[in-house]
Amino acid sequence: MLGAIKSEIRKIFTTKLWWGMGIGMAAFAFLLSMAAASLIGLTNPDGSSAGFDSMTGATGQMVYSAGLLGEFGSMSALFPLALGVLLITTEYRHKTATATYLATPRRWIVAVAKTLAVIVVGAVLGVVHVIASVGGGALVLTVFKDQPLLLGNSDVVATYGTSIVATVVWTLIGFGFGMLVRNQIAAVLIAVAFGFLGQLILNIAFAILGWTTAAKFIPGNLTTGMLVTADPTGGAVESGGDSYYFSWWLSALILIGYAAVLTVIGSILAGRKDIT
């Protein structure tokens, strides 16, 4: 088992794919955190508050995780999602999975090893995302806003951890989906299209229909529920408030559930297919 895990981890980190995705994700995380930080201290044309008067623990959570939030299109999350898809579909496309299955006849060992390797690379991307987000947000807050960074605030520190968990889960969702849809081009296009446009369309549709409970189950909204545990406007802006999100722990459980279902079903189907 240990040898299989090491082999799968080595297989990932000896390619350029993971760090290429990491660079792209870091760039989006940096820019979106800059955008979120730029909202701090803004006022409406009539001089009234736009909602983000100053840095608090909740606004810090928003700023330092902006790239993953549904409100920002979960743009950073698309990279671990696509990486998860590519890691497994590349093996199917180039038949490298065949050699793995022949070398390790017990397919459940292969499935566990691959899943753990995906968790490792997802965690690495999560750390990269946190660093890039802090860098982008801190730059704007320090240079343009003269606001405290609150990097050691307990709520903000908690968001560092949940950001890493969220990145791991999005990578696993892509991995599980890639095992179900083995055509690489189709899998990537469908996953990314849903991650961006699909979630946007669902949010709009559910808002029009007034289906606030259904909207809570959208992955991007679950991610927001995980990362931002209080109203970043401090109640200054009227909104749906908590009605749009589950509690952070329930959001995390449901999102992890999505990844678990896709990964388990994909692994079972992969274990039953003939080696080609």
Could you tell me what each predicted segment is?
Residues 15-16, 105-107, 182-184:
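Short loop-to-helix capping motifs
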Residues 81-108, 115:
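Transmembrane helix boundary and interhelical loop/hinge segments in multi-pass membrane proteins
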Residues 253-276:
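Junction motif at the cytosolic side of a transmembrane helix
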